């Protein structure tokens, strides 16, 4: 009898035990794992995020540099090899760098298949997994033949390939190296070439794919890794990549206030149930989405000092609800919360139209809510003056005149 195999990969520094102000605040990965039924027809696996093991230095490297992602991928792969039988349905879920882990794991399985470890000792099994990872997944061209003691479980696809029933991820973050904001650490530790092999493209062997993306995240080092919507899909497959209200952890979970993240969780669970995931309905009933829930500020604390970059998001048009925008986004836009209104005022500027906006110096970014028509030509002009203490600045920068120490 075919069974479901559920792999859940958590985000950076995320664990089931994490708390905020003494209150439990697990991510959506933990919640999905908890509400998934475990019985003979469905097995589940959870892995905490990078940066959760070892001492302070190890945790900093794991969270900031991405050290540990490769090991997390191999651990989840080994579990799949131990539990998979031909015809089983593989579900991969993840958040943040855990989403990157899940997508990379999907690329690993798509390229190499699953090893048969049933006749090997633990030491032999881990050696085989590491070997297939290093020689079969990382290089651009994997070997065409493996040694005789390397056996692979046949999958149901042409050529014996293993298919992946579903990949569901919240706000994939693909920055494995040190964030660019941390220049010194970047020079010491970051080697982008080391991580180029990670395959996060959506393989044709993935039948169903779902990606929930955060509309309001502005941290530059948390840039999303989107799927290419033009990727070829199986005839019976499906693909949805939707934007949700909130910052990174408002979508993937991790705050004590869960109105927004519960919306992204409920969407993902409903999509997974539709393709065969088994859940406990009493636990699912505890998920309470609120489109007007608290929208947090992730660019605060130490992040306030680092580089920010708003995401390129689609316009908030009701016609896009349910396709590229979640219904939650449009509902919050239409009737915003009283304490955080308005939400993404939107205007598409037609050719020939004019609009004047106030731009303030204090915020890093001034959201305009203006969208332009693709392929059209527009003209822009700026005027006015900003004051930084007693230093006058115009659109071209500090105004010429007497040298002032504050310019340094």
PLM regions: where:
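Active-site- or binding-pocket-proximal scaffold segments within functional domains
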Residues: 1-373, 379
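N-terminus-centered regions that define maturation/targeting leaders and the start
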Residues: 354-373, 377-408
């Amino acid at each position: 009898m075919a069974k479901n195999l559920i792999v859940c990969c958590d985000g950076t520094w995320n664990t089931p035990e994490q708390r905020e102000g003494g209150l439990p605040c697990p991510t959506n990965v933990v919640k999905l794992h908890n509400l998934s039924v475990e019985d003979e027809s469905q097995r589940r696996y959870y892995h905490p995020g990078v940066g959760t093991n070892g001492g302070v230095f190890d945790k900093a490297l794991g969270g900031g540099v991405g050290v540990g992602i490769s090991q997390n991928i191999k651990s989840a792969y080994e579990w799949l090899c131990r539990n998979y039988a031909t015809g089983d349905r593989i579900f991969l879920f993840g958040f943040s760098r855990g989403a990157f882990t899940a997508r990379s794991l999907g690329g690993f399985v798509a390229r190499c298949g699953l090893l048969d470890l049933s006749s090997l000792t633990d030491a032999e099994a881990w050696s085989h997994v590491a070997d297939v990872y290093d020689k079969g997944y990382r290089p651009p061209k994997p070997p065409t033949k493996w040694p005789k003691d390397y056996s692979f479980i046949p999958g149901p696809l042409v050529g014996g390939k293993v298919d992946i029933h579903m990949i569901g991820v919240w706000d994939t973050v693909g920055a494995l190296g040190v964030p660019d904001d941390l220049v010194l650490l970047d020079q010491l530790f970051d080697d982008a070439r080391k991580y180029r092999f990670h395959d996060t493209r959506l393989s044709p062997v993935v039948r169903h794919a779902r990606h929930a993306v955060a509309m309001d995240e502005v941290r530059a080092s948390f840039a999303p890794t989107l799927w290419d919507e033009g990727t070829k899909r199986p005839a019976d497959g499906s693909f949805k990549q939707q934007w949700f209200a909130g910052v990174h952890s408002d979508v993937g979970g991790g705050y004590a206030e869960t109105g927004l993240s519960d919306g992204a969780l409920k969407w993902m669970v409903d999509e997974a149930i539709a393709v065969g995931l088994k859940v406990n309905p009493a636990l699912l009933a505890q998920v309470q989405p609120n489109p007007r829930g608290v929208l947090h500020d992730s660019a605060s604390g130490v992040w306030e000092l680092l580089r920010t970059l708003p995401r390129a998001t689609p316009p908030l048009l009701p016609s896009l609800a349910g396709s590229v925008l979640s219904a939650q986004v449009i509902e919050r836009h239409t009737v915003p919360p009283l304490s955080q209104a308005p939400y993404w005022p939107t205007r598409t500027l037609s050719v020939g139209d004019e609009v004047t906006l106030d731009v303030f110096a204090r915020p890093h970014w001034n959201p305009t809510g203006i969208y332009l028509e693709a392929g059209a030509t527009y003209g822009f002009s700026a005027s006015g003056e900003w004051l930084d203490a007693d230093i006058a600045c115009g659109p071209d920068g500090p105004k010429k005149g007497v040298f002032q120490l504050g310019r340094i």
